[in-house]
Amino acid sequence: MATRMGTGVGKGEASWECGREAAQAALAEIGPAARPDLVIVFASPRYDHEAVLKGIRSVTGQAPLIGCSSAGEFTERGVSSQSVVVAALSSDAMRFAVGCGRGLRQNLSRAVEDAVSGFRGASPESLKAGLVNRTILLFADGLGGGGEALIDELMVRTALQYELAGGAAGDDAKFQKTPVFYLDDVLTDAFVCAEILSTTPLGLGISHGWSPIGPTMRVTRSEGLVVKQINGRPALDIYREFARQQGVTLEGDAVVPFLMEHIIGWIYQEGDQKLRVTLWPLEDGSIVCASEVPEGALIRLMKATDRSVIETSGRASRLALERLQSAPLAGMIALECVSQRLRVGEAGVAQQLQQIQDVVGPTPLAGCHGYGQLARTRGTFTGLMSASALVCAFPRA
């Protein structure tokens, strides 16, 4: 039994043709006789996403499809901007099912219930076939917030039987619309997911390159993506005081770059932080973050170097390969944070890709930059992370 993965890239002005071009290239790599069992799509917001999906489906037919809008795409061939990337998986060693949860803000519990209703991980047929390793690959609207709650609800609905790996959709750092893709549909306020059942574990790895600086503080007021107060003071005042200690006057155009270089680390267990990218200030001194920081959370400010950010991708890849337990590699999905791309630029992103390839060699790879990474990996991490790299490695057998 074997699993094969192929990738393709589409570029140009015409959305339908870009989707078709990427899908044709991906299917050519898995072989002319193979049919795709799962199609994964990352597409720049420059395109008409409905037309992109029609172009892809003109090639892949009714194969299960999930994906999301992105903020930069890449494959093993190199880094691309404003493109369409398609990954196609064909396997007689894995079983796939896809689901969709709509209306996350209105009824999260119902959305998750709908999405996983067709999953078969605990069925007698799956157990008899030896498909005892269960993974959910998911993509969520990147502007909807609630990533932590989504992971928690998925864990409850699936009785902690699955590892989770995925990302929050992006839109080239415009922060306007971040849809997800399900079969023929382009959806907001939704998440999409694929159940992956396998005899061999998938390799999941997540890593970041940030270190805490300064004292531990408490978020005393927050609402959704907005941190209003830290230690009882406006959040921006805390940053201004910290900046003065670094010899920086935090005013005008200096504010946003300083926030992006000193993000929040939410202390979720001793010695570990869930990263939250700080984006921009509001007039009342609040700070908008890329993902939620709960009221009452203990936090520290975080700092990184360009080199530590670039090396994150290689570390995540090594962790993923360790989880494969020496199984041969069929291909990888890599999910990076747009904050990394904004920090290190296109040249740095190319170095990140090289970091992955230095670890895994010339293997099929599809990835994108988005607005956060979603994960549940046994013994390491559960929840939503920003400014990080997440890798999902598919075993060949």
Task: Kindly label every feature range from the protein language model.
Residues 1-38, 42-64, 68-363, 368-397:
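Small-residue-enriched flexible segments
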